[in-house]
Amino acid sequence: MTHLTRVSAINWNRIDDDKDLEVWNRLTSNFWLPEKVPLSNDIPAWQTLSAAEQQLTIRVFTGLTLLDTIQNTVGAPALMADALTPHEEAVLSNISFMEAVHARSYSSIFSTLCHSKEVDAAFAWSESCDPLQRKAQLMLDYYQADEPLKKKIASVFLESFLFYSGFWLPMYFSSRGKLTNTADLIRLIIRDEAVHGYYIGYKYQKGLEIVSPGKREELKKFALDLLMDLYDNELAYSRELYGESGWFDDVSAFLCYNANKALMNLGYEALFPAEMAAVNPAILAALSPNADENHDFFSGSGSSYVIGKMEETADDDWDF
């Protein structure tokens, strides 16, 4: 373990990379907590789902919880160790915290909609689900390795690709008017993950600028090989989750769509052709910031999530 002997105070008035402040401001302005989303409004819709749909939903959210836990406790801290500026380190600490909020959010969904025994069964399932455990181990292996740029590649794939086999389901239900408040919460998570993937991809591209052309080619090959390994595993995971639902093909297209986005965050061209990444328009509409009238996606306001604003009052404000 490395023991610090000296820490310098961070000075936000002397910034080496303006992107650090830009992303810090975006993340802090996007701040939210699950307690502000009225998940209990989804109880009637939850009760209309079949037992199989309920089990699928709980398993999907359990898998997402595992990925958020990895990113919170291992992934973002591993990237912090490679930060080039204190401001980058601060942004990554914010990312780490919000991943903990995301993990907490799924527990809020569980405690609101589900019976404890059903949730316990899903967590037990997650420990024995081979594709889920394999992708978790792949992430841990790269986060615990010594190559900073490879860590960033793995992190972008987690943020911009691996989450989306799970995100598909609440968007599907939302497109059919079910679990709409849960979908509001998931959109908040997706909004965060989009910024995380963009920022870490940006830092990766900055890192490429200072390595040799040969190293750049090596890293590109590594990224493509890792993506295909993760993609094959994600197909297996999605088949285990969605195989009996009839939704597997739609989920597969969503995977290709987001794999291409992950590559673009790294500065690479899309890999999967348009016909493989043709997402159901209803899912894309559900992903839209304006998909649900209950929620203002960018401002964090709306009927489902409201932060009060303070305003000074005068004596005559109280004359009724």
Residue locations for each model-derived region?
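Non-heme di-metal
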Residues: 1-320
